[in-house]
Amino acid sequence: MDAKTDDNSAGKCPVAHGSAGRTNRDWWPNQLNVQILHQQSSLSDPMGEAFDYAEEFKSLDLDAVIKDLHALMTDSQEWWPADFGHYGPLFIRMAWHSAGTYRIADGRGGAGAGQQRFAPLNSWPDNVNLDKARRLLWPIKQKYGRKISWADLLILTGNVALESMGFKTFGFAGGRADVWEPEQDVYWGPEGKWLADERYSGDRDLQNPLGAVQMGLIYVNPEGPNGNPDPLAAARDIRDTFARMAMNDEETVALIAGGHTFGKTHGAGDASLVGVEPEGADIEQQGLGWASKFGTGKGGDAIGSGLEVIWTTTPTKWSNNFFDNLFGFDWELTKSPAGAHQWTPKGGAGAGTVPDAHNSAKRHAPSMLTTDLALRFDPSYATISKRFHENPDQFADAFARAWYKLTHRDMGPVARYLGPLVPKEELPWQDVIPVVDHVLIDEQDAEALKAEILASGLSVSQLVSTAWASASTFRGSDKRGGANGARIRLSPQKDWAVNQPAELAKVLDKLQAIAKDFNAAQTGSKKVSLADLIVLGGNAGIEKAAKAAGHSVDVPFWPGRMDASQEQTDIHSFAPLEPTVDGFRNYVSGKQRLTVEEALVDRAQLLTLTAPELTVLVGGLRVLGANAGQSKHGVFTKQPETLSNDFFVNLLDMGTEWKATSDAKDVFEGRDRKTGEVKWTGTRADLIFGSHSQLRALAEVYATADAKAKFAKDFVVAWTKVMNADRFDIAG
């Protein structure tokens, strides 16, 4: 008998829209997602391995691009007419929203990869009609091609927009290389609906690492919290969300007032007449969304946020008029034509002072958002706003600096900045590291220093732990942290609990003494920095541990790191880099949003590691004794400080049965199946390599009888990658 076939239940093409079979994540939604370690690979990159964006950008005629952008600002297109005959305000919003997703907690978001082109950002409610802004830019991107990335072009266009309306910007740096697929590692919130706010608990406590109040918003709801038009409540939301982007009160006021000096919001009619976002639109829309059936759907009939606000009398010219109007009128609550809460001057004041965006015969009164009034009624914001109102030069300088910080915050050290418009001034938020000012040590010096380090009495565990603690702060998201700068000896890092401050101080004292003696013995300008010596010490420890396991390895080393000063280290800015959970070191502190194993993969992604690299590093760090507090969890070996594959061999031993020691299931005992004797203890960060099928497959590679040499070799490669993660001055 022939089997029945059912087109509705049979296997489907895995790329079919809406008809693919259930994925593993559908069946097991709590399954650990290691796929975030394999995104942005060469398989999705059309540019090829030889493509070097930095070199392409250096050959770009930047002046020509800027000239073309200036021309575009007033070249209004019939298919999407420019408000007030000038696209500048639209492009400022585009650039702001490209950069404004950045959050300091994990360094994710921001403008650095051009993610506004992809879902979900291209379809967020707060990014309504920015699809048109990017389409307006396409002829310029098409003209200059690979020499300027979308990521750089979005920000440069925002700068040119400001300049074209009479504002002097602080500077611009290129160097943001595009990616070619949506980022899968960014947690945007738990909600399943746009504008929902399940991210709050308690007394409006916003979940970390989030930086926006509702799903699909960049920062705050302009109508006030959940649409409640309360300026003081809005101020609380503003302060929280902007702080999560590393902005203080002065920078916050400058950004809001500066941005709202220009342009308008769009709420000409019933928002229900607006169609779906780009990702949900029909194929013939060609990636555009929010098609509106209200009037012409564009120009004077455009609907975006639903608010219909024009702040100033000169919306395409830099001025202090935002503050003139903010303080010059008493405001009363009203509603836009789309029904959104906004504010207008009482008693009809200000009527006729503001131009219409598309009809020169019309005039209006100015209007404000609830979040604008927060700058007047919140005491701290009001003090700053009044000062800016009375001192326009201070306002302009503050906005220029805050805009530069907003648009460059996720680029990492200045060494990555490209182009002739990079300012010379060093800024505290740039994590400044001194330029190399001495002759670097050579290979012979490095060998001598390693021998001296090993003779100092420092153990393999101490050396490896210190080097790892120094380097593993790196975040590939915003290119912060890492071993360069030796900030592990400075506040706040030297006092982080995960770094075992007392033990760390002993190691650093010995390494500093070795560096001091070496430098004093030189007759020329040759020196070794502590930053280099910390990494070199870790390498020495690994080579010693490998030798103990019967392997001869040379851990690669490139000198050239420098030591930053405490004055070059913003304690408040560095605080979010402190790990509260670190599976690489089997460390957990307090309640976490993520499980230990999720946090381990998240940390690996920030370190730009692959799943094999994550696996081999955890196995190696355990046997080398790198656990915080010298915990024995996961140290599955009888030969500690030996670079063996024992972690994997013993984890996968079927003679061991694992059981949780408490209902929390965070610590486990591995008992001999026959005798019941406790052989090992481990955490979720250990047992996940035997539990998760993909990680177990990798663990099996390193547990085989012929894998000892491969394990040592692969560990060294992965270790070196982490040690050099922040070395933007060297190739590879």
Curated annotation (Swiss-Prot):
This enzyme's EC code(s): 1.11.1.21
Region Disordered: start-end pairs: 1-24
UniProt keyword terms in alphabetical order: Heme, Hydrogen peroxide, Iron, Metal-binding, Oxidoreductase, Peroxidase
Cross-link named Tryptophyl-tyrosyl-methioninium (Trp-Tyr) (with M-245), sites: W96-Y219
CC per GO annotation: cytosol
Top-level taxon: Bacteria
GO biological process: cellular response to hydrogen peroxide; hydrogen peroxide catabolic process
Classification via CDD domains: catalase_peroxidase_1, catalase_peroxidase_2
Catalytic activity, reaction form: H2O2 + AH2 = A + 2 H2O; 2 H2O2 = O2 + 2 H2O
SUPFAM superfamilies xref list: Heme-dependent peroxidases (SSF48113)
Site (Transition state stabilizer): R93
Crosslink (Tryptophyl-tyrosyl-methioninium (Tyr-Met) (with W-96)) position: Y219-M245
PROSITE patterns: PEROXIDASE_1, PEROXIDASE_2, PEROXIDASE_4
GO molecular function: catalase activity; heme binding; metal ion binding
UniProt PTM comment: Formation of the three residue Trp-Tyr-Met cross-link is important for the catalase, but not the peroxidase activity of the enzyme.
Pfam family, one: peroxidase
Cofactor note (record): Binds 1 heme b (iron(II)-protoporphyrin IX) group per dimer.
Active site, per annotation: H97
Binding of heme b, residues: H260
Cofactor(s) required for function per UniProt: heme b
Family stated for the protein in its record: Belongs to the peroxidase family. Peroxidase/catalase subfamily.
Record note on quaternary structure: Homodimer or homotetramer.
Cited function: Bifunctional enzyme with both catalase and broad-spectrum peroxidase activity.
NCBIfam families in UniProt: cat_per_HPI (TIGR00198), PRK15061.1 (NF011635)
Name of the molecule in the record: Catalase-peroxidase
Gene: katG
